[in-house]
């Protein structure tokens, strides 16, 4: 089945009881039991809810997993995945990993005895060099946030398996429409469903899936034990958003490429980070392992100090956190999404104060270009 069709008909696409084409919102906290220990598959909505279950089946279907899990946020899902590890374990993290993931690991999980080494995961030699006897997991973003680095998933997964490591991939930027890490050797895939999957800036959610039954059982335990589950209303919203993911991603990519090409030629821009440009260092790899390049891009201005006045002059591009909605968003990672990363470490990774990140929406491309141009006109 083609992905475009699977987005609509995958998972549980209708209600088994009534035949409703839209899975109903089961707004309930508990369920009647026939007798003690005998129920119809659901006993308490933290442990399971039919609306959430339909979403979980859908993400597993889209990513090629055996089971999916829906959480109250992307970070709640990532926390559950890292709960698979034990005190004393070591993890490899990307040097431009999302700031929230960095904060979770370095402010919370370290207190539980976990440690990490920050590396450029797009460089396989750095991965091999950083592996220690107690390394248990390799955590990847590809494309990465915010520098849009592309990591060779098949090669990394192969190295990880040789060393007995879990390969965990944040697939938020690419979405299942453009990339399926499990099919390339990864063990676990995580998503911020808040972003492209929801697509309308109206829901906060996290999704996890794996193609390993044993891992699925462990994640299911942590999902229930920790309790950061997604509610039925948000589960329904996310399923509705996913139905149009294909159409939206095509529009996001079309506009992003147009914007990237415009920026690459602009005299006030120093560098553009977009894997859909032939000038991107991993362009050929992106073409090989992805079916498209998504709608995220970043660029640096020639004068770092102009980033703030530039983004504050934009009108259609909304200055705000998050990404992946139908509307275009702009941010300065150094002061927003990645502000929790120490400045020296941030700059060493290439996240300068003058780096601007765009989540290119699905507006008319000419309006977006004109908005960018008028903002450029207001800086030196």
UniProtKB/Swiss-Prot annotation:
The biological pathway it contributes to is: Amino-acid biosynthesis; L-methionine biosynthesis via de novo pathway; L-cystathionine from O-succinyl-L-homoserine: step 1/1
Major place of residence: cytoplasm
State the top-level EC class: transferase
Which purpose does this protein serve, as stated in its record?
Catalyzes the formation of L-cystathionine from O-succinyl-L-homoserine (OSHS) and L-cysteine, via a gamma-replacement reaction. In the absence of thiol, catalyzes gamma-elimination to form 2-oxobutanoate, succinate and ammonia.
Q: Which CDD domains match?
A: CGS_like
* Assigned EC number: 2.5.1.48
Point out residues bearing the modification N6-(pyridoxal phosphate)lysine: 195
How would you summarize the temperature dependence of activity? Optimum temperature is 45 degrees Celsius.
Q: What is the scientific name of the source organism?
A: Helicobacter pylori
Q: Which family does it belong to?
A: Belongs to the trans-sulfuration enzymes family.
BP GO terms, sorted: cysteine biosynthetic process via cystathionine; methionine biosynthetic process; transsulfuration
Q: What's a Pfam family in this record?
A: Cys_Met_Meta_PP
- Location(s) in or outside the cell: Cytoplasm
> What is the activity regulation entry?
Four natural products, alpha-lapachone, 9-hydroxy-alpha-lapachone, Paulownin, and Yangambin, show strong inhibitory activities against CGS. All these four inhibitors prevent the binding of OSHS to CGS in a non-competitive fashion. These compounds are specific inhibitors against CGS from H.pylori relative to E.coli since they exhibit very low inhibition activities against CGS from E.coli.
How is activity influenced by pH? Optimum pH is 7.5.
Annotated Gene Ontology cellular component terms: cytoplasm
Q: Which reaction does it catalyse?
A: O-succinyl-L-homoserine + L-cysteine = L,L-cystathionine + succinate + H(+)
The protein's name is Cystathionine gamma-synthase
List the Gene Ontology MF annotations in alphabetical order: cystathionine gamma-lyase activity; cystathionine gamma-synthase activity; pyridoxal phosphate binding
Q: How is it used?
A: CGS from H.pylori is an attractive target for antibiotics discovery since the four natural inhibitors alpha-lapachone, 9-hydroxy-alpha-lapachone, Paulownin, and Yangambin also display strong antibacterial activity in vitro, highly inhibiting the growth of H.pylori, whereas no antibacterial activity against E.coli in vitro. These inhibitors might thus be used as potential lead compounds for further research in the discovery of anti-H.pylori agents.
Question: What does the cofactor field's note say?
Answer: Binds 1 pyridoxal phosphate per subunit.
SUPFAM superfamilies per the UniProt record, alphabetical: PLP-dependent transferases
Q: How does it assemble?
A: Homotetramer.
Q: Which UniProt keywords apply?
A: Amino-acid biosynthesis, Cytoplasm, Methionine biosynthesis, Pyridoxal phosphate, Transferase
Q: PROSITE patterns annotated for this entry?
A: CYS_MET_METAB_PP
Write down the required cofactor(s).
pyridoxal 5'-phosphate
């Amino acid at each position: 089945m083609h992905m475009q069709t699977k987005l609509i008909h995958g998972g549980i696409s209708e209600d088994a009881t009534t035949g409703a084409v839209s899975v109903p919102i089961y707004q309930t906290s508990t369920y009647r039991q026939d007798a003690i220990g005998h129920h119809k598959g659901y006993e308490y909505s933290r442990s399971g809810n039919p609306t959430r279950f339909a979403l979980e089946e859908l993400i597993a279907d889209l990513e090629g997993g055996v089971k999916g899990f829906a959480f109250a946020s992307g970070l709640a899902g990532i926390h559950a995945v890292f709960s698979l590890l034990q005190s004393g374990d070591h993890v490899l993290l990307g040097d431009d990993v999302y700031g929230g993931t960095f904060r979770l690991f370095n402010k919370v999980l370290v207190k539980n005895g976990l440690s990490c080494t920050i590396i450029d995961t797009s460089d396989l030699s750095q991965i091999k060099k950083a592996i220690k006897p107690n390394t248990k997991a390799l955590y990847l973003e590809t494309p990465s946030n915010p520098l849009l680095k592309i990591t060779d998933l098949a090669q990394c997964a192969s190295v990880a398996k040789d060393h007995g490591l879990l390969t965990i991939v944040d697939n938020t930027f690419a979405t299942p429409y453009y990339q399926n890490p499990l099919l390339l050797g990864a063990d676990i895939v995580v998503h911020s469903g808040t972003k492209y999957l929801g697509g309308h800036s109206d829901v906060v959610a996290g999704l996890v899936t794996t193609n390993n039954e044993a891992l699925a059982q462990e994640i299911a335990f942590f999902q229930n034990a920790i309790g950061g589950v997604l509610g039925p209303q948000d589960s329904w919203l996310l399923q509705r958003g996913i139905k149009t993911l294909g159409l939206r991603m095509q529009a996001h990519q079309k506009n992003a490429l147009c914007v990237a090409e415009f920026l690459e030629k602009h005299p006030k821009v120093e560098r553009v980070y977009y894997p859909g440009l032939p000038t991107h260092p991993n362009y050929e790899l992106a073409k090989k392992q992805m079916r498209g390049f998504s709608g995220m891009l970043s660029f640096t201005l020639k004068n770092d100090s102009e980033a703030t006045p530039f983004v504050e002059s934009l009108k259609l591009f909304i200055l705000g956190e998050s990404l992946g909605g139908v509307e275009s968003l702009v941010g300065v990672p150094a002061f927003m999404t990645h502000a929790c990363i120490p400045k020296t470490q941030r700059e060493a990774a290439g996240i300068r104060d003058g780096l601007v990140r765009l989540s290119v929406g699905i507006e008319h491309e000419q309006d977006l270009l004109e908005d960018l141009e008028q903002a450029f006109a207001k800086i030196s």
